[in-house]
């Protein structure tokens, strides 16, 4: 399990029987947070923590663990050479965002906007997604992706 708060409490609540649709409602309360930490305390002897994205595939391939949370792109990258498969049911989606810091010079802000405009084009997003199995930020890129690439993405449906 990823060593950090991000998604760890969500997985703990699901392990404790909370329906995925109710996780954030439960987690919003102090009792829900305590419930998640209590479940983690219970599971702690069986958890092997990871900090780097490359660790889950290594732990799985070596037999150190029988299942793990992992970045889908890391598992997709080694699927062909291993018996590892992604199980989407019970997974958590993640996303990132571009940001331009307030107070940048006009020149730097314009360069950042130009960079974002380029990288967010469907063609560029398609190249990105074909190199690591993460869904493109621009939905129009999905039609440019081969079916085999789409199969490794949670956003393909």
Question: What positions do the PLM features span?
Answer:
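Solvent-exposed loop/turn segments at secondary-structure junctions
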Residues: 4-8, 72-76, 91-93, 105-106
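Periplasmic-binding protein-like
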Residues: 1-10, 33-34, 39-42, 82-102, 118-141, 149-153
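A ligand-binding cleft/hinge motif common to bilobed small-molecule-binding domains
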Residues: 67-83
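Extracytoplasmic ligand-binding site segments that recognize negatively charged/polar headgroups
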Residues: 1-57, 61
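Short amphipathic alpha-helical coupling segments at ligand-binding clamshell hinges
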Residues: 35, 39, 106-119, 127-130
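A bilobed periplasmic-binding-protein/Venus flytrap-type ligand-binding module shared by bacterial periplasmic
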Residues: 13-17, 95-107, 127-130
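Short, hydrophobic alpha-helical packing/hinge segments within bilobed ligand-binding/sensory domains
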Residues: 56-59, 112, 125
């Amino acid at each position: 399990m990823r060593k950090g708060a991000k998604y760890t409490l969500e997985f703990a609540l699901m392990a404790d029987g909370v329906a995925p649709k109710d996780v954030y409602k439960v987690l919003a309360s102090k009792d829900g947070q305590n419930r998640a930490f209590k479940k983690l305390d219970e599971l702690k002897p069986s958890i092997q923590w990871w900090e780097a994205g490359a660790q889950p595939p290594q732990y799985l391939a070596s037999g150190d663990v029988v299942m793990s949370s992992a970045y889908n792109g890391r598992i997709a990258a080694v699927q062909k050479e291993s018996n590892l498969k992604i199980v989407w049911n019970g997974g958590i989606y993640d996303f990132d965002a571009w940001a331009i810091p307030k107070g940048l010079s006009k020149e730097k802000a314009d360069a950042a906007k130009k960079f974002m405009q380029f990288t967010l084009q469907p063609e560029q997003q398609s190249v990105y997604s074909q190199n690591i199995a993460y869904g493109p930020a621009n939905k129009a890129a999905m039609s440019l992706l081969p079916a085999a690439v789409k199969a490794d993405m949670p956003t393909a449906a």
